[in-house]
């Protein structure tokens, strides 16, 4: 129960060592009071240490024997009968204990001053410290503050302010427009404000394509490759088709001339009326009714 205190360097003591050192000093106070009752005015330090060691060994033996008797009867905590049996086995007269406790010249050892725990400011405290479980002795140091070992997840609250949302949407729209204009400036035709440096302040060319659907009508590269891989017989057929196309073009030219002459005649006949190619936009003409004879 009272293990021997080992000497430790200053500044390297643990809470357990401090606790055992306090118990050792308590035994020294008890030995000093017993020497005072016996009539001694002073004692050497070595003598006090020897008597303290003897008292510590005696009390340790009492505790060890009481513990063994307790475990022998299938119990975990020693009781008063266990201590009485231990004292009897060690040759101590148990009947003299009441008279010794009631002696008149005994010295009363005052309790040590109670040191209050330092008050931690509320600004530095985070939560309440948990008490020790049943299996941890009370003289052990307290648990640290909960914020040192408890994990608290953090998250941002969603922004619900209308003004902030509008500003965020406007900034996103502006960023998208800038990215799109930069992409168009790098991939398409651009115009520059400065003749010397064309890369500074590029402007997207505002000239639309003359025939926007021309790309859709042109053959793709795959079709051109297939045409190149055709046989020589297909080339002959192509020449025939070219000749036919020339004849057709000649016929088309003749037809265009005839249409032009017809249009001129119609324009001469009806100056106010204009020829409209779209049949849905032409003026309505009433059919002529034939009279019955």
Curated annotation (Swiss-Prot):
<feature type="domain" description="Histone-fold">
    <location>
        <begin position="25"/>
        <end position="92"/>
    </location>
</feature>
<feature type="short sequence motif" description="Nuclear localization signal">
    <location>
        <begin position="280"/>
        <end position="293"/>
    </location>
</feature>
<dbReference type="Pfam" id="PF10406">
    <property type="entry name" value="TAF8_C"/>
</dbReference>
<dbReference type="InterPro" id="IPR006565">
    <property type="entry name" value="BTP"/>
</dbReference>
<dbReference type="InterPro" id="IPR019473">
    <property type="entry name" value="TFIID_su8_C"/>
</dbReference>
<keyword id="KW-0963">Cytoplasm</keyword>
<comment type="subunit">
    <text>Component of the TFIID basal transcription factor complex, composed of TATA-box-binding protein tbp, and a number of TBP-associated factors (TAFs).</text>
</comment>
<keyword id="KW-0804">Transcription</keyword>
<dbReference type="GO" id="GO:0006367">
    <property type="term" value="P:transcription initiation at RNA polymerase II promoter"/>
</dbReference>
<keyword id="KW-0221">Differentiation</keyword>
<dbReference type="GO" id="GO:0046982">
    <property type="term" value="F:protein heterodimerization activity"/>
</dbReference>
<comment type="similarity">
    <text>Belongs to the TAF8 family.</text>
</comment>
<dbReference type="InterPro" id="IPR037818">
    <property type="entry name" value="TAF8"/>
</dbReference>
<dbReference type="GO" id="GO:0005737">
    <property type="term" value="C:cytoplasm"/>
</dbReference>
<dbReference type="InterPro" id="IPR009072">
    <property type="entry name" value="Histone-fold"/>
</dbReference>
<dbReference type="Pfam" id="PF07524">
    <property type="entry name" value="Bromo_TP"/>
</dbReference>
<keyword id="KW-0805">Transcription regulation</keyword>
<feature type="compositionally biased region" description="Basic residues">
    <location>
        <begin position="283"/>
        <end position="293"/>
    </location>
</feature>
<dbReference type="GO" id="GO:0030154">
    <property type="term" value="P:cell differentiation"/>
</dbReference>
<dbReference type="GO" id="GO:0005669">
    <property type="term" value="C:transcription factor TFIID complex"/>
</dbReference>
<keyword id="KW-0539">Nucleus</keyword>
<feature type="region of interest" description="Disordered">
    <location>
        <begin position="247"/>
        <end position="293"/>
    </location>
</feature>
<protein>
    <recommendedName>
        <fullName>Transcription initiation factor TFIID subunit 8</fullName>
    </recommendedName>
</protein>
<keyword id="KW-0217">Developmental protein</keyword>
<comment type="function">
    <text>The TFIID basal transcription factor complex plays a major role in the initiation of RNA polymerase II (Pol II)-dependent transcription. TFIID recognizes and binds promoters with or without a TATA box via its subunit tbp, a TATA-box-binding protein, and promotes assembly of the pre-initiation complex (PIC). The TFIID complex consists of tbp and TBP-associated factors (TAFs). Mediates both basal and activator-dependent transcription.</text>
</comment>
